[in-house]
Amino acid sequence: MATKRILVVSDLHGSRMAYGKLSNAPKIYDCDMVILAGDLTGKAVVPIVNRGNTTYDVVIFGDHKIIKENELEGTIKTIEMSGYYTAVMSREEHEEISSNDNRINELFLKVEREKLGGALAQIDAKYSKDDVKLFIMPGNDDSESISRFVKQYTDGSKTFIDIDEGIANFEDLQLLGFGYSNKTPWNSPRELTEEEIDRRLNELFDRSEQKRMNKTIAVIHVPPYDTMIDKAPELTADLRPVIKGGDAVMKSVGSRSVRSLIEKYSPMLGVHGHIHESAGVDYIRDRSTKKVPVLNAGSEYQDGVLRGALLTLSDSGIENIMLTRG
């Protein structure tokens, strides 16, 4: 193949600004293929309550504010830039929803589908002009409802390819996708035991063309255990960071099964995310002692920053991996 440039991003968590930057990224980085490696949606919906007199009540990052009509659009943009969603509603609607857990969940599912659909439509409008492909999958923080939405949205698309627990091809490359994670303290929607990860990933690799592992990118949301890209703060029983000498104590939180399977199958590259603060590139030795590169682009979605990893590939393999931030 001719020299190819691929942009890898992950963990955008619904950030309106990060998605906007992603829509422009292929022109900036001169690439015709993008991988979005999971955690697509936001964390919560922030209600903006109409007081009935052209003012609104809203709690922004813990601070209650009363805003005017002419401040509404800017407030929505500020909130959604950092990965939260917004919903403007009347006092009556807010009272009804806030006292009913089912209605809260229904609202969140409705809003996250609408917002993700809007972000993907913005991307499609730009990528389709230059025939750029985006390989996408949900992560552990995305609901199974979003997993189904992504499958439906991408079905028949010329721009998007859903790779969650699937195999796709791009020219001579083979991509495997797996968006679940191991168990976390946060009890997120798509977590599995190590045994289940091992079983399902083995099944996925077994379905692939194993003679093409030297041209295979394994897109696995959770990083492999005991690497430079799986370090997160150690937490106490009440989920507070452990501090020693004024610094947070870091520990490996990646998947042992993912590491074992990379050692076993030896793909060309492992692409990961999940641990926002562990951007970087590391190497795992397979069973023949060959080094397999694994990367995590990291995430600063809450600041509207798009972090990435720009890959340069040629017939001989990976020429360069450059971490990006913009």
Task: Please provide the spans of the model-predicted regions.
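Binuclear metal-dependent phosphoesterase catalytic core
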Residues: G14, G166-E171, L192, K264, ...
